[in-house]
């Protein structure tokens, strides 16, 4: 059996001692602690030694305890002053005690029976008792415990508990309890056999230095063998939060594809941008409190410039110049002013189109949205969407399907994708995209479509616009290989450590 130099030295000592503490082995072998521990673990893995560990309760002296060991406990200093003067006031005690020490001192002196307390001319006075005189030369359990701690720095808890309760020591902040691992190493029968056969001690060299090469000394030394297949402890180096990394990669990918990221000013939108500018009628059920959140205070925001508002109003009421009949109701600007947390990132697309865009042009945003829902492994009430649109004169619905499929396959790593007809007030035709997840089955990613003219024309756009809003959290589930969407925002250290890096 191949053994390293450190293993041989440790095994030989164990043959002599049969059983030894870790500290004893360090002392006897002359090796450092790391080398001895490494040797013990290797010997144990080879069945030549056994490592026994048990937890031992210890008490360590605190910084305050060290201070009191030097200058004395507050009651001892107060007692010394009382013996000198016979009678003291609180002002007298301030000469030897801090304000923090002064507060409990009267109670301690009375409890110990060292002083009586009374008022003389409205001044609180402490007078020494006979018991107090005798106490100056007697040690209490707490005095002995402090002396032991000051001398040894660390003692077994049972040694202190024989004197007084640990609670008293900890309450006074003189000592603190801790757990300490006690290690003992024992040689096995196989270890005894190997050690008894005679082990040649030849120090090994683990590093080939320039000096060894120049001097030729490398010819006469034995180099340490490294087992590159040996099992080692798994390391968890620092890394970025997996989901955050995924979002950054998508952002970079879209920019590489020529998309421009939209500027986002706030998480709060007016209903105008969230619904009205998207040609969603004010009596639509999706605007109900069960499907969206509303701000209680402030309740109302501001509408954009009057010209744009009038166009949107006309589009809703009678279709404006689009050839549509609109929704045929009286549009209410007060409803459009209501504030709400953004319900979908498409509100950002409406804002961008209203500001003006390059034609042809491609735009995107990755933003947080909020919707009332039942939390489960595929639904959150606060989640991210990647919203985007492409504007150009020759764009068709087929271009949109191609972009969506590329998203699912290249970005999410989906193997199977399907499209189903859908309905949205602001797109026609509309489509829903789903992808197949091994654990969850078919998972809906989001919706898409061609923006209706009733939406785009009031915003000043006269060419086709294809658009989509995709639940990026669900894309991340595919890419990160998880089956519960809540893990994306989890503080679970095990998951954060073991989650794979994407791309």
Curated annotation (Swiss-Prot):
Location relative to the cell: Cytoplasm
GO biological process terms held by the UniProt record: phenylalanyl-tRNA aminoacylation
Residues annotated to bind Mg(2+): 428
Database matches in Gene3D superfamilies: Bira Bifunctional Protein, Domain 2, Winged helix-like DNA-binding domain superfamily/Winged helix DNA-binding domain
Reactions performed catalytically: tRNA(Phe) + L-phenylalanine + ATP = L-phenylalanyl-tRNA(Phe) + AMP + diphosphate + H(+)
Cofactor binding notes: Binds 2 magnesium ions per tetramer.
Chief localisation class: cytoplasm
Keyword Metal-binding applies: yes
Cofactor(s) named in the record: Mg(2+)
Classification via CDD domains: PheRS_alpha_core
Matches recorded under InterPro entries: aa-tRNA-synth_II (IPR006195), aa-tRNA-synth_II/BPL/LPL (IPR045864), Phe-tRNA-synth_IIc_asu (IPR004529), Phe_tRNA_ligase_alpha_bac/arc (IPR022917), Phenylalanyl-tRNA_Synthase (IPR002319), WH-like_DNA-bd_sf (IPR036388), WH_DNA-bd_sf (IPR036390)
Domain of life: Archaea
Entry GO CC: cytoplasm
Positions bound to L-phenylalanine: 346, 385-387, 426, 451
Family: Belongs to the class-II aminoacyl-tRNA synthetase family. Phe-tRNA synthetase alpha subunit type 2 subfamily.
HAMAP family the record matches: Phe_tRNA_synth_alpha2
Record's subunit section: Tetramer of two alpha and two beta subunits.
Protein name: Phenylalanine--tRNA ligase alpha subunit
Species of the source: Thermococcus sibiricus (strain DSM 12597 / MM 739)
């Amino acid at each position: 059996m191949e053994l390293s130099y450190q293993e041989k030295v440790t095994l030989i000592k164990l043959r002599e001692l049969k059983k030894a503490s870790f500290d004893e082995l360090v002392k006897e072998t002359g090796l450092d602690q790391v080398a001895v521990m490494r040797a013990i673990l290797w010997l144990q893995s080879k069945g030549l030694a056994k490592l026994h560990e048990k937890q031992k309760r210890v008490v360590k002296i605190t910084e305050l305890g060290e201070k009191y060991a030097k200058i004395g406990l507050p009651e001892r200093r107060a007692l010394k002053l009382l013996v000198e003067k016979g009678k003291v006031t609180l002002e007298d005690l301030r000469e030897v005690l801090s304000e923090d020490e002064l507060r409990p001192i009267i109670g301690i002196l009375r409890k110990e029976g060292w002083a009586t307390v009374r008022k003389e001319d409205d001044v609180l006075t402490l007078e020494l008792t006979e018991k107090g005189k005798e106490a100056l030369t007697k040690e209490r359990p707490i005095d002995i415990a402090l002396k032991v701690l000051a001398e040894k720095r660390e003692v077994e808890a049972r040694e202190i508990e024989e004197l007084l309760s640990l609670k008293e020591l900890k309450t006074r902040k003189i000592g603190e309890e801790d757990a300490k691992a006690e290690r003992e190493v024992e040689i096995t029968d196989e270890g005894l056999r190997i050690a008894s056969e005679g082990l040649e001690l030849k120090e090994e060299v683990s590093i080939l230095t320039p000096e060894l090469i120049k001097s030729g000394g490398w010819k006469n030394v034995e180099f340490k063998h490294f087992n590159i297949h040996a099992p080692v402890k798994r390391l968890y180096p620092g890394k970025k939060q997996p989901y955050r990394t995924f979002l950054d990669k998508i952002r970079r990918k879209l920019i590489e594809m020529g998309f421009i990221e939209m500027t986002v000013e706030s998480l709060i939108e007016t209903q105008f941008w969230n619904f009205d500018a998207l040609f969603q009628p004010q009596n639509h059920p999706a605007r109900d409190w069960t499907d969206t959140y509303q701000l209680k205070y402030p309740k109302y925001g501001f509408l954009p410039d009057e010209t744009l508002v009038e166009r949107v109003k006309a589009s809703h009421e009678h279709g404006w110049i689009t050839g549509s009949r609109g929704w045929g109701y009286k549009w209410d600007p007060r409803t459009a002013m209501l504030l709400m947390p953004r319900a979908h990132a498409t509100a950002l697309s409406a804002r961008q189109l209203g500001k003006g865009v390059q034609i042809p042009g491609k735009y995107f945003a990755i933003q947080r949205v909020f919707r009332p829902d039942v939390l489960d492994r595929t639904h959150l009430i606060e989640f991210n969407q990647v919203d985007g649109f492409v504007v150009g004169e020759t764009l068709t619905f087929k271009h949109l399907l191609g972009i969506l499929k590329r998203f699912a396959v290249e970005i999410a790593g989906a193997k199977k994708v399907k499209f189903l007809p859908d309905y949205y007030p602001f797109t026609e035709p509309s489509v829903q995209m789903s992808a197949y997840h091994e654990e969850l089955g078919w998972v809906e990613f989001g919706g898409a479509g061609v923006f209706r003219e009733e939406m785009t024309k009031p915003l000043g756009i006269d060419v086709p616009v294809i658009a989509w809003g995709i639940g990026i959290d669900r894309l991340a589930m595919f890419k990160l290989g998880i089956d519960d969407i809540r893990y994306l925002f989890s503080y679970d250290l095990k998951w954060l450590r073991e989650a794979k890096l994407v791309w």
